[in-house]
Each structure stands twice: as C-alpha cells, then as structure tokens.
Amino acid sequence: YREAEILADGARDLNEMISALAQLPLAFHPKERWLYSMSIDVLAHLVECVTGTRIDALLQEYIFDPLDMRDTGFCLSNAQLPRLMTNYGRYKLEAIAPLNKIEHVLEENNVASMYPEQSSEYRRGGIGLYATAQDYSAFARFLLTGKSDTGEKLISNNMIGLMRANRLPLSALPLSISGQAFPGYGWNLLGRVMTDLGQGAVPTALGEFGWSGAAQSYFWVDPQRQITGVIMTQFMGSNHPLHEDMLNAAYATL
C-alpha cells in the first residue's frame, strides 16, 4: 500500500484508487484469515458498480440528509472551508506505520494532498469524510436507535442486530491491528465490538462498539446503557491514550 501510495494519493478518484489497488497481490486467500485493510473501499467501489451511483451521493441520500448531517461530506464548500481545524502530527499515515505512536508535538500537518478539501471527485469507502462533532453525534445516535433525531425509522431492528454482531471467529482473536491489541474486542460491520469483559482493558459493557479515525476522532455506542460518545481531534499519530481516558471518565460517572 505504501509503495504504491494507495492511501496517500488523494488526486485519484475511487475508481482509480481501486484500479491501483487491484494491481497488488492478495495478502492471503479469501476466508483464510481476517486483516484490517482497505476492503471497505473496495466495497464502496462495488456499491457504485451495482447501483450506478457514486458513493458520496448514496451517503448523502440515505444517511446525511435523513440525519440532518449538514456539515458532513468529502468536499467542503467555500462557506465551510474557514471552519476547518488545523491538522497536527505527521503528514502521511505511512510515516506513522499506522498504529506506531510518535512523539506528541504540535506540528502543523498539511494533509491536503491525501485528503483534498475541495475536490468534487474525491471519495472513499473508509476514509476522507469531513464532519463536525454535532453531525458525528447524530450518526452515533442513529446507530443506537436506528432512528433520526426526529424519530424517523431509517433501518430495521433486524439489520441493526446484524450490523452489531461480532464477525470474527475465535481463531482470529484476540483482535490485533498493526500490532496494537484490542483486548476483549471482536469486530462487527461497524468497527470493534466488546465480546469479553474479562479480557477488556476499559470499564465498558458487552456489545459496546465503535471505531476511530486517522486523526484520532473516535466514537462509541453502548446499547446496554443507551449512551453514545464522540471525540473529535486533529492529530495524526497521537501517543496519548485519549480514547481509553475518555471511556474511563465517561463510565466512572455512571
């Protein structure tokens, strides 16, 4: 991925990125094992091929508009651009070997070539969205209830259950991504999901799920306690355990 600049080249549209990715060999045969990868970008490309509609338009129609997520998308408007927060850390994910932590120094980090701010062609399945804490919170609440904040049912309870269920066999546990362990967690269609409290390192609940972003954004949903949480930062490769600290603080108040 790094040598071919699959992630780093934001000038490619989704079709071009998948074409470049398709030139690389598979890490293993399908069903042999599980690997955190760019599979969701491949899925976005397949969705475009099947529907004949771009993934950004589908997200807008089925998620962003119904949830009133007015500040979420791949391309910022001229009105939104001045509100974009500065990114800090290291320029490329390749430079931080995705989950190897770097010295926590506030250096401004120009990521525009990787995440174009105003390119109408840029779109991905797994990275690259701009959003606000308000919008991200609306999305987290939707994953908790299946409804918009106005009460509109957007997804069936059966589908919610299918999305939340752990998909990893015991042979793929404990969950580890690029050398970083996630004790107690499996993986569902929405990110990591707590399956074994006895192995967990944070005071959470069975079925709690969520995931993080490259610049340390983070969300979690706890169906048991009916709560959600969102953290928004702009630091690539932070070495501070912010996610764990916030989970500990949140659950300490319950």
Model-identified regions with their sequence ranges:
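Short, surface-exposed loop or secondary-structure junction motifs
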Residues: 1-203
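Short acidic, gly/pro-rich beta-turn/loop elements at beta-sheet edges
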Residues: 173, 201, 231, 240-241
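Short, hydrophobic/aromatic-rich segments at coil-to-beta transitions
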Residues: 203-209
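Short, small/polar residue-rich loop motifs at catalytic or cofactor-binding pockets
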Residues: 213-215
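Short, well-ordered beta-strand elements
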Residues: 219-220, 225-235
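Generic C-terminus detector
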Residues: 234-254
